[in-house]
């Protein structure tokens, strides 16, 4: 079972952002419009090495995560010692 978002979760990684966009087949420009950041900013975020984020970048990562989860029903899966990180699309609720 995948972990759900909690305060302890790290920010989503650049690879997770790229993977989610690939799964959804959306461009950096489309995602940028949704989270109100420039395509150039997304290019930098997706190319940045993993590591600590300053408050501004963490806010952008959090906005991307919220948009992907709420708007596109993406689920981010965080490493737990037995599995690595990943993304998947949530199933729609059954009637």
Annotated model-derived regions:
Residues 73-95:
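Helix-turn-helix/homeodomain-like alpha-helical modules used for DNA recognition
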Residues 36-56:
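Recognition helix of helix-turn-helix/homeodomain-like DNA-binding domains
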Residues 56-76:
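DNA major-groove recognition helix of helix-turn-helix/homeodomain DNA-binding modules
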Residues 2-23:
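A short, Lys/Arg-rich alpha-helix, primarily the initiator
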Residues 17-33, 94:
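Short basic helix-loop element that most often maps to the first helix and adjoining turn
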Residues 26, 37, 73-74:
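Short glycine/serine/threonine/alanine-rich loop segments
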Residues 30, 41, 60-63:
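Residues in the helix-turn-helix
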């Amino acid at each position: 079972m995948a972990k759900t978002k909690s305060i302890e979760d790290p920010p989503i990684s650049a690879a997770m952002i790229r993977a989610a966009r690939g799964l959804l087949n959306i461009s950096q420009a489309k995602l940028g419009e949704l989270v109100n950041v420039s395509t150039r900013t997304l290019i930098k975020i997706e190319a940045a090495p993993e590591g600590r984020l300053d408050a501004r970048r963490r806010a952008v990562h959090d906005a991307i995560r919220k948009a992907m989860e709420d708007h596109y029903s993406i689920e981010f899966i965080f490493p737990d010692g037995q599995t690595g990180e990943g993304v998947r699309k949530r199933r729609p609720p059954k009637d």
